[in-house]
Swiss-Prot record:
Protein's cellular compartments: Secreted
PANTHER family: BETA-DEFENSIN 113
InterPro entries: Beta_defensin_dom
Function (record text): Has antibacterial activity.
Natural source organism: Rattus norvegicus
Assigned keywords, A-Z: Antibiotic, Antimicrobial, Defensin, Disulfide bond, Secreted, Signal
Lineage of source species: Eukaryota, Metazoa, Chordata, Craniata, Vertebrata
Protein name: Beta-defensin 18
Family: Belongs to the beta-defensin family.
Domain of life, source organism: Eukaryota
Region forming the signal peptide: 1-23
Gene Ontology annotations of biological process type: defense response to bacterium; innate immune response
Disulfide-linked positions: C39-C65, C46-C60, C50-C66
Length: 85
């Protein structure tokens, strides 16, 4: 009886340890989202191939992240003076 209980507990420990953690499809989905977000942060776009005036930043799920060569950061506040009348 004790050996059957030991085997049962070992089986339970194995089942619970294998079932914990993210599955492969969840990890793949998270990786795709992270790569797409990194591409978006630098002002890029995930495409099948980049043009001659773009460079490859990182690889997205669908292909390279194409960023314009003359990338300039978007400023939150405009430095141009406002005209008031």
């Amino acid at each position: 009886m004790q050996s059957a209980m030991k085997l049962f507990f070992i089986f339970l420990i194995f089942v619970f340890s294998v079932s914990c953690g993210p599955s492969a499809p969840q990890m793949k989905t998270r990786d795709v989202l992270e790569r797409t977000h990194k591409c978006f942060l630098v002002g890029g776009e995930c495409k099948s191939e980049c043009s001659s005036w773009e460079y490859e930043y990182v690889f997205c799920y669908t292909g390279p992240c194409c960023v314009m060569r003359e990338y300039k950061r978007v400023e939150k506040f405009s430095n141009t003076p406002k005209y008031t009348t």
